[in-house]
Amino acid sequence: MPAKYHVHTEPTPPKHKVIGKYGIVDWREDCSACHNCVKRECAYSVYDSERDRLQGATDYVDYLYECKGCLCCVQSCTKGLLTQEVNPEFEALGDEVWTPDIISSTWFQAETGKIPVSGAGYSGPFMGPGFDAILTDMSEIVRPTRDGIHGREYISTQVEIGRKLLSLPLNPDGSLAEPYPPQVDIPVPILFDAMPWHKPSTKVTAAIHDAAKALGTVALTDDRSNLREWPDSPDVVKLVRQAKSANPDLVAMVRLPLGPESIARALELTEQGVDAIHACADWHGNATDGTHITKAVRALHQAFVERGNRDAVTLVASGGISLAEHVAKTVICGADCVAIDVPLMLALECRLCKNCLEGIACPVGMADIDHDYAVQRIVNLIGAWHSQLLEMMGAMGIREVRRLRGEVGRAMFFEDLERDCFGPVFGKRKA
């Protein structure tokens, strides 16, 4: 049994002003100047040194949106002069997949290394597109929960990347008749992928590589690793064999875009000796035919199972994975591990403005980012994700992430629930 894996996080405040979600509008015209003003009781000290800060006009708007949204001052003001508003700049962040809340949550995790807590309860919605159409089944009754996040019980998140033997051929003396294929062991089922829309600066790339090294995982853009990736092409198998002949310890992975032909191609590559398949969707999690990554990976996993060689190959999935829960849900759909890209940039304070694509200056100056700062922010993010993965697995009663692969019984798919449970009662959904 491998040793317990622990990510060493430490607070790493942002270099630039974070775009806050909430702000308080103060209608001072009718203020009674109470000596015990509710502003003084702010749990987050947002109003400290208010007078000094308001004298400078440069950061006035930033100051307005430092509110954490607890509503304590709004509800307690005796004159009802305080009103909470949503920052329009916050609402403009990202898009329908990389939502402002996801971006803000990623910033928080990269800063603190802690699990984000959104409130005392969740009122919905309980279903949405993509990953939100999957509910993880916390099966406490089926199996007792495990408490791995606090260290009292052991939960393993280690995975092995590489080809596995479906059987062990033995010599008469009991020794292996052929050598065991090379593998790359990583303590957390998360790889670091290349950016989807542009090549980052040398400093950002170096920080990603060193963060991967500190975490014990692999950056797919790092040539120093024994895990090498090739894009799919007609002669990719030839290239893989040439590389493996020069380095027998090399684990070869082929990057295969998800689409209508990906299942047949993945089966073909596996039969020709490829060690791992990197099934990639676009950065919104969609295959070339519009299928979401969860459905595409599930179909690919099932094809391997029906062929009887699922354990012979490692399946890495990437595209649209923006939260820790998406890691668990992708593994449930059949992937061995995932690769992430955009969350790494968000950890470095990226705002998804895409100015870099148009040659416009980055608002956070990412090209000149401090190395140690960037490494620690990425480590903090993975530390928070790792803790959430342990929480989910513990609630499911699963003690290692390898057992979670393809375990669809630990999840509820909304389409199945609608067809089998709600459909017969309420009929076909109209919207």
What are these regions (language model features)?
Residues 209, 240, 244, 266-267, ...:
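Generic structural signal for well-ordered alpha-helices
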Residues 346-412:
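Active-site or pore-adjacent capping/gating segments
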Residues 1-38, 43-190, 194-210, 217-218, ...:
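Conserved, well-structured core domains of diverse proteins
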